[in-house]
Amino acid sequence: MRMRKKKNLDVRFAACADVMAFEPKEKRGKWRALFGNDNPIHLEIGCGKGRFAIGMAEQHPDVNFIAVEREEGALIMAAERCQQQPLPNLRFVSFDAAELREVFAPGEVDRIYLNFSDPWPPNRQRKRRLTWRAYLEVYDEILRQQGDLCFKTDNQRFFEWSLQEICQFGWLIQNISLDLHNSDFEGNVMTEYEEKFSAEGYRIYRLEARRRLPEDRKSVV
């Protein structure tokens, strides 16, 4: 279901200027300057209402977090939540994932989070899946050497498809969990969807995938 458009968005976003990053394409290659430090940059693509990004920024003050959400109705809720107690290491931004190359320079990002991305039907709309090879190629460009991707979902088929796609791309798969909430993984921060799905009895699947150097990738093809 598509979220209904919120009223007075321009005014509300302006009131959240302390936690927003407007005109993201102008910041390409300059994101660390925005934060005023050289700390690692972690990027969440599809942050929803911001629970995960805020929780991670609170837990890791030495990491800069950029939370992306194209649905402005959800993004304003995230920004207003954070605006109540702004975090210097977190910025929210609105753009489509297809524009990542225009927003981030090569090697500018240290880690990417994909949390409960839309599991578009694999036969008809697989190209819209954020773990599709074309997106992996983009991540491969904007991530630093040996940067990594963290992926969570409640959809087993989507998880298995993504695992295969990432393996075929040549990245190193690490820390797979087929039942995250009943594992020994520490430091998990839940999203709104994660809490809902877990309460309904769904398993949560998680993996980490590390970018390989080109010479290392040849050895596994």
Explain the meaning of each model-derived region:
Residues 158, 162, 169-218:
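Class I S-adenosyl-L-methionine
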Residues 46-48:
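Class I SAM-dependent methyltransferase "Motif I" SAM/SAH-binding loop
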Residues 75-77, 159:
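Short alpha-helix immediately C-terminal to the canonical SAM-binding loop
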Residues 1-41, 51-58, 80-106:
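S-adenosyl-L-methionine
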Residues 71:
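Conserved SAM/SAH-binding beta-strand->alpha-helix loop
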